[in-house]
Regions:
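A ligand-binding cleft/hinge motif common to bilobed small-molecule-binding domains
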Residues: 101-111, 171, 176-180, 207-241
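An extracytoplasmic/periplasmic, membrane-proximal ligand-sensing/linker region
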Residues: 33-35, 179-180, 220, 243, ...
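Hinge/capping helix and adjacent helix->loop/strand transition within the periplasmic-binding protein
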Residues: 86-92, 107-195, 244, 257-290
Length: 329
């Protein structure tokens, strides 16, 4: 009787697994039957929002349903991430997760209501861009990144840098720069990168670390110069500008990025279906061109590749926080 019971139990379990698998496959085949919502953790009008709206337009055309951008800013991205983490795992609520909320917050904040690895499933990378260091476009500012380093080392505590906010990726990039060259540089956080660079050109800061979208707007003013870019190799987003590594700080690489995530528990075949559609959109020449115009590089990936990247970013930013002692104000 025990043998028969085991056989019956094994058959029952196999049937359950087979049924669940079939339901998942059928769900992926039917998706979507209604509009899809993508949570963006920034307010309307910024580059992250702009990129998602570009992708949403073309993705909606491909899947035959509207893709609606829902802006949920606040709490360093935690509001939007939490919303998706607790949403039904059915493919109808997705997250455009920025590197800060996904990879930096876990190291900066002791008590987060979410775990990006536990609560989210990677779908596809969407876009990326390096950061840059800018100085005022005047004779008093350093002529090169090497000269900036020399000044910082020669004048402990006299130089200052601005960022778009305490705990931001640009803040941590500035701290890693300070740590790497062994200099004392004062951090001045602002509520937004535009205020940081306009303060700098008025003579109240030595430098600013900003993203390439902010850089593009600042360069149009003619009042700033870009000294270096934080990508491992020179970037087409910042043509002709040397990397930080070229100036003598080896292995210095910091990039901003955002990717598409689904709630944990979303069926793997549905995740694969969404990822395929998103990557198709990001490969379109007109989409790549429009994303580039926002100051970002379109960047699609498989779910597995994004998952591996997120794990590497979590380790990277944890090391930066540990080495620099940076904390949000």
């Amino acid at each position: 009787m025990k043998i028969i019971s085991r056989v019956l139990l094994a058959g029952l379990l196999a049937g359950i697994v087979s049924s669940a698998s079939a339901q998942g496959t059928a769900g992926a085949a039917r998706w979507p039957t209604r509009s899809v919502r993508v949570i963006v953790t920034f307010p309307p009008g910024g580059s992250t929002d702009a990129v998602m709206r570009i992708v949403a337009q073309y993705l909606g055309e491909r899947i035959g349903q509207a893709v609606v951008v829902d802006n949920r800013p606040g709490a360093a991205g935690a509001i939007g991430v939490n919303l998706v983490a607790h949403a039904p795992a059915d493919g109808y609520t997705l997250l455009l997760g920025p590197g800060g909320a996904i990879a930096i917050n876990p190291s900066l904040f002791e008590h987060l209501d979410y775990d990006p690895v536990r609560d989210l499933v990677p779908v596809s990378a969407v876009a990326r861009a390096p950061f840059v260091v800018m100085v005022a476009n005047d004779a008093a500012a350093p002529a090169s990144f090497a000269e900036l380093i020399a000044r910082a080392r020669a004048r402990p505590g006299e130089l200052s840098y601005g960022s778009g906010g305490s705990g931001s990726a640009m803040h941590l990039t500035g701290e890693q720069f300070r740590h790497s060259i062994g200099a004392q540089i004062v951090h001045v956080p602002f509520k937004g990168s535009v205020l940081a660079w306009t303060t700098m050109v008025n003579g109240q800061l030595s430098m600013v670390w900003v993203d390439t979208t902010t850089m593009n707007g600042a360069l149009k003013s003619g009042k700033v110069r870009v000294l270096a870019v934080t990508s491992r190799e020179r970037s087409s987003l910042v043509p002709g500008v040397p990397t930080v590594a070229e100036a003598g700080i080896p292995d210095f690489e910091m990039i901003g990025w955002f990717g598409l995530f689904a709630p944990a528990g979303t069926p793997a075949d549905l995740v694969a279906r969404i990822s395929t559609d998103v990557r198709h959109v990001l490969a379109l020449p007109e989409v790549r061109e429009r994303v580039f115009a926002t100051g970002n590089e379109a960047w699609g990936s498989t779910p597995e590749a994004l998952g591996a990247f997120v794990r590497s970013e979590l380790a990277h930013w944890a090391r930066v926080v540990r080495e620099t002692g940076a904390r949000p104000d």
